[in-house]
Amino acid sequence: MLPRIFGNAKANGGTGKFKDITPEVLEELKELNITHIWYTGIIKHSTAGERGVKGTAGSPYAINDYYDVNHYLASRKSSRMKEFEALVERTAQAGMGTIIDFVPNHVACDYVGTQAPFTDENYYPGKTFDGDWSDTAKLNYTSHDTWVKMRDILLFWASKGIAGFRCDMIELVTVDFWKWAIPQIKEQYPGIIFIGEAYQPENYWNYFNIGGFDYLYDKSGFYDTLRRIVRGEDSASSITRQWQQLGDFQPKMLNFLENHDEDRIPSEYFASSPFKALSALFVSLFYNTAPFMIYAGQEFGVGPEKTSIFDFCSLEPLRRWNKGVKESDSQKYLHYEESDLYAIYKAFCDIAVNDPVICKGDTFDLQYANFENGNYNHHRQFSFLRHYEGTVYLCVANFEDHRVDVEINIPQHAFDYYGIQPDETLNPNERIKVSIEKNAGTILRIK
């Protein structure tokens, strides 16, 4: 979430504050089974009137003082850091961890830095970027002084009690820096997590096994594939190829259907309706044990416009939701479809976090056993088994815009793999009949 947007009660202008993320707000988020909150736009960035700034607020990724927080988020400028620390503490008391951004590749063109300021040796020759990143200057990692300063920045924020860092555009920084820095942070702060924004699957091995990252974005795999399937531009069976390419990295990939860089689900460039992507949500949450990220407002169907991270603005459904939270009824001012969508997200997240078969079990892809199945469209349905301690679920997603009645083959290999003894009702020769609503999914316990 961007606190300046999340807590903003004004339709035009204005900004949310640290204080708007109250214990009551956090309790509601915890009800959605959230484990960590990624607070975006915390560290001080360039704002309107400064060199090359985008929008009315500026980009959270054009940082101009790595040892400060944004003044506009505080009720009192002089107490801004204490207010952030109080937010971290409130979040922890609510049973969740705080994630903040670490932007290693670049800083704002007007970077000042109240501590350990950057000098010419810390910048790449040419300094400023062209095009979309024209408000930033690239850091020079051929200088070891840059490594030291960036490590010290990580240590500074880790000392605030945060649970982890979401690291921006990690592939633009040498993996050797991460190999050097991450173990030093983890030595002093065991348990702190590093999430990397990465887009090239061929680099995953290096950033996991050499760089030391705990999780990487799964944008180029599951996200891109599921988006194409929802739009009717790819086969549901393409999901198989994605998990096969990931291999053992599957549990370490961060799944999502929205973030600040991508279109909102209701956009015409994605699903056109938040309900049309529920089959993609089903697969993202239930296919494996990987973590899943929800972008603030996604659970209410915010959109179709992409939410600006560069402006002082607000989101109407979040304004109404926050108003309801203040009156001890978070659903009070939500529209019917928003409440309905939220209930679905909550039910899905309850299963994903609390059902041991889903949150701990392993997976058996059934697509290959149903390619020749005349009662199953492998281009528009996707099926798999989840297994844990003798319990087996059959999970089937339907990407069609209408309800379907399908029959699923479970091959002998699955019975052997899970040690299931066939019987009259469950065996490789009998297909299992399943009814699935449009753009949805079904879970059946079969053992």
Cite the ranges covered by each PLM segment.
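Solvent-exposed beta-hairpin/edge-strand motifs
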Residues: 410-425
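Substrate-binding/active-site clefts of carbohydrate-active enzymes
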Residues: 2-160, 181-189, 203-205
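Active-site-proximal helices and loops of the catalytic beta/alpha 8
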Residues: 152-155, 163-164, 168-256, 268-274, ...
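Asparagine-centered strand-capping/turn motif at beta-strand->loop junctions
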Residues: 395-400
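Hydrophobic faces of well-ordered beta-strands that scaffold small-molecule active sites
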Residues: 37-39, 98-100, 165, 194-196, ...
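C-terminal beta-strand-rich structural cap/linker in extracellular carbohydrate-active enzymes
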Residues: 428-447
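Substrate-binding cleft of secreted/luminal carbohydrate-active enzymes
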Residues: 281-303
